[in-house]
Amino acid sequence: MKILIKSRKDIERMSQTQFEKHTALISITDSGCEFVTLKYKPDYLLQLDFDDVDNDIFLDEPGHIPTVEERKVLECKYHMLSDEQALQIASFYYDTKDVISTLICQCEHGQSRSAAVAAAIMEFRSRRGISVFAHDDYYPNKVVFRKVLEALKDCIPVCDSNSRNLQNETKNR
């Protein structure tokens, strides 16, 4: 599977023609903003909105490690990637991984949130996520990376014997 990292402008330009068959797109926008305008849509599409806020929001007092409750309050206040959204990304990956040849991860500038999602998937698939962190064009959001990677590890694919549809269950943490 080819994994691409793109910006809003890149995707809007790409969508002026048909996407290649077997393409999936994880499209991320800022909270409260419109989703990317697609003239043509890929075979599989997941659209999410959350802001590009990283770990530094938790470092307001030197030596203070925020509690789980404090983290949740900050995550909500700053519209960060939620655990539920991370599970949506993991489920989307599991639901499409065997039927796609290209996965595109897109955010506003194609540098932080989309890079983090791509890095988490690459790390999960082949332990090559570090290549995104090492690339000069990207600055992966560490919160997004961590949450998506955890969701990928926690999300267990289960085949429903009646419908043969892929469903996901989460392990107890």
Positions of predicted regions on the chain:
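Helix-loop module immediately N-terminal to the HCX5R catalytic loop
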Residues: 46, 50-103
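Cysteine-dependent PTP/DSP-like catalytic domain, specifically the C-terminal lobe
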Residues: 119, 123-173
